[in-house]
From Swiss-Prot:
Organism classification: Eukaryota, Fungi, Dikarya, Ascomycota, Saccharomycotina
Primary residence: nucleus
Protein's UniProt name: U2 small nuclear ribonucleoprotein A'
Assembly, per entry: Associated with the spliceosome.
Function: Involved in pre-mRNA splicing.
Matches recorded under SUPFAM superfamilies: L domain-like
Family designation: Belongs to the U2 small nuclear ribonucleoprotein A family.
Length: 233
């Protein structure tokens, strides 16, 4: 389905638990982001979960009200460098269960204010030193994959990749070479919590997915993380 002006204008809007105005565009089989400018920078959260997006782009420039993108359960494999502006004010992105399989050098420029990032369920998380490299690329991060970024992790990342983020040392360069590696990109249904909650029932998995898709604060993320450690949903 195309994300037309009519679809956007007819989409429901809610106040989320944090009181942030949220545009609900989930479950519409949307394949490409477009026409978001007609929202006139009104929304703090845009929920695009459970669609068929293959890239993250076409975010209007000067959308300084937009703080959170919920993008779980799509087929996103890359950030569109040309149409994803660097002057955004986004602090939280949930990309749970997508197809991101390689690092992009633009990560360090595209997320200047990003504090919370969820990439679980993406092939990239299986790469060696994945967590350290993401922390190095996006130093503003406070929470990555439901875990607080620790000062010791920041130090380790700088020990590995250097303190100058304008230069990529040999190890950093190696992290970008995943494009030549043959990786199986699963469909959404195959990826869903495949390696994350293997012992949970189908009903529990759906509850977990719902929580992942709507978590927008550090407090929520910490609570979900504790639940997972204790085996609760």
């Amino acid at each position: 389905m195309r994300l037309t002006a009519q679809v956007i204008n007819e989409a429901p809007e809610i106040l989320n638990p944090e009181g942030k105005l949220t545009l609900l565009l989930r479950d519409l089989q949307i394949t490409e982001l477009e026409n978001l400018a007609i929202t006139q920078n009104k929304y703090q959260v845009i929920d695009l979960s459970n669609n068929d997006l293959i890239s993250l782009g076409n975010i209007p420039k000067r959308f300084n009200n937009l703080q959170c993108l919920l993008l779980s359960n799509n087929n996103i494999s890359y950030i569109d460098d040309e149409s994803f502006p660097s002057d955004n004010h986004i602090t939280s992105i949930t990309l749970f269960n997508n197809n991101i399989y390689q690092f992009q050098k633009s990560f360090k420029d595209k997320f200047p204010k990003l504090e919370t990032l969820i990439l679980l369920g993406n092939p990239i998380t299986e790469m060696e030193n994945y967590r350290y490299f993401i922390i190095w690329l996006i130093p503003s991060l406070k929470v990555l994959d439901f875990k607080k970024v620790k000062q010791a992790e920041r130090k380790t990342s700088e020990d590995m990749f250097g303190t100058n983020r304008d230069e990529f040392n040999s190890l950093a360069q190696q992290m970008f070479k995943n494009e030549n590696t043959e990786i199986k990109l699963d469909g959404k249904s195959d990826r869903q919590v495949k390696n994350f909650v293997k012992k949970m029932t189908d009903e529990e998995r759906q509850q977990l997915l719902k929580k992942l898709e709507t978590a927008t604060s550090i407090e929520e993320i910490e609570r979900i993380e504790n639940d997972l450690k204790e085996g609760a949903v």
